[in-house]
């Protein structure tokens, strides 16, 4: 699963996920892309599950790029633990997603196959997505 090899700080503040995606909003590596329409956060497990679904759908042909990386740690306290006594332990990693962010790209497969693969991947994700095609090469 995806997670940073090392970080400057172990835990981060919750923060807010505002604004639109400026960087990473265009299909730049492949021909087809899966773009986020709503905001949210994708866990490393969701990113990997969608990647596996796409790889299986295209029968390991073509090439797939993952354009998001989970770099934010999410902490949780154990069950039945009283409030206080510090922040919980890091349980999983997420990538913050803004509307307009390209999540995955694909090349080397027919458009219909790419659409089917992205539809399978979109079912694994917690944000609404749309299929996009690269306009200028």
Curated annotation (Swiss-Prot):
Highest taxon above the source species: Bacteria
Function: Binds 23S rRNA and is also seen to make contacts with the A and possibly P site tRNAs.
Subunit field text: Part of the 50S ribosomal subunit.
KW DNA damage (keyword) present: no
InterPro entries in the record: Ribosomal_uL16, Ribosomal_uL16_bact-type, Ribosomal_uL16_CS, Ribosomal_uL16_dom, Ribosomal_uL16_sf
SUPFAM superfamilies hit by this protein: Ribosomal protein L16p/L10e
Organism: Tolumonas auensis (strain DSM 9187 / NBRC 110442 / TA 4)
Protein name: Large ribosomal subunit protein uL16
UniProt-listed GO biological process terms: translation
A GO molecular function held by the record: structural constituent of ribosome
